[in-house]
Amino acid sequence: MFVNLNKSLIAQRFAKARQSYVENAIAQKKISHHLCHLMQAYCPLHLSRIFEIGCGSGNLTQELFVSFQIQRAYLNDLYDEVKQHFLDEQPIEWCIGDIESLSLPEHLNAIVSSSAIQWVQNLPQLLGRCHHALNDQGWLCLSTFGSDNFKEIKQLTGQGLSYWSVQDWQVHLQASGFELMKIEQQQLKMQFDSPRAILKHLKATGVTGTVATTQPHWNKQSLAQFYHDYCQFQTDDGHYELTYHPIYIIARRTS
C-alpha cells in the first residue's frame, strides 16, 4: 500500500520537526550540496530570478546564494515557520502554500528543488507549469527520490511513496519541453544504532508521512515486532541501515 498524501498533515509534521530537522537532516544536506555542485557544472553564474520549491530550512538556498549571483529568490514551502531560517536582508520573496495550487512567479532563470517534489501528486502538470514560468533556456534543477528510498521501511510495513524512475523522468521532461542535461542517481546508506533510532530520525526530519509512525496499529507489540524484523538490515559492525535513493536532474527549457 502506498501513502495517500494529506498535505495539511505533511505541513504539520514538517512544522513540528523544524528545529530537529536542522540537526538531523544529514542526508538531505548531502543531497542539496551535490545538487548545487551539479548546478555549478551546468548553469551560468548569473541566475537573477530563481524559484525554489520546498525550501525547508534553507540547505539548498544558502548554497545557491554563495555559489550564484541571485537578485531575487522566490521561496516556497507549505508552512510559514520556515521563514525563521532566513535572514531579513536576503533578497527573498515568500510563496507559502501548496505548490500544486499556487501561482508561480514568471520570467524565471531557474526553478530548483531539493528533497521536496516527491510530495507532489501531479508531477506532469507541475512540469508544464514550470516550463511556462521559465524564460527561454531557463533551468530546472531538482533532486528527488527513486524507488529504493526507505526500502527497508517499505519492505517491513508495505507503506511508502510512489516514485518516478530515471526513465520516467526522461520521458516526462522531454514531453514537457525540457532538454535533459544531466540525470544521475545515488544510494546513500545511513547507519543507526538501533531500529528505534531510525524511527526517531524519520520523526525528527518530518518525513513520517512515508511510514505509519503515527498510525493506531503502532502499539507496544507491533513496535517490538518492527524492531525485531529490522534486524535483517543489521550490518556486520552492528549498525542498522536506512537507504536514501536520490535522483538528480539538470534540465533546460527548450521550447
Swiss-Prot record:
An example molecular function term from Gene Ontology annotations: carboxyl-O-methyltransferase activity
InterPro entries: BioC, Malonyl-ACP_OMT, SAM-dependent_MTases_sf
Catalytic activity: malonyl-[ACP] + S-adenosyl-L-methionine = malonyl-[ACP] methyl ester + S-adenosyl-L-homocysteine
Keyword Zinc-finger: no
Superkingdom field: Bacteria
Gene Ontology BP annotations: biotin biosynthetic process; methylation
Keywords associated with the record: Biotin biosynthesis, Methyltransferase, S-adenosyl-L-methionine, Transferase
EC number annotated for this UniProt entry: 2.1.1.197
Pathway: Cofactor biosynthesis; biotin biosynthesis
Bilayer-spanning residue ranges: none
Purpose: Converts the free carboxyl group of a malonyl-thioester to its methyl ester by transfer of a methyl group from S-adenosyl-L-methionine (SAM). It allows to synthesize pimeloyl-ACP via the fatty acid synthetic pathway.
NCBIfam families: BioC (TIGR02072)
Family: Belongs to the methyltransferase superfamily.
Protein name: Malonyl-[acyl-carrier protein] O-methyltransferase
Gene: bioC
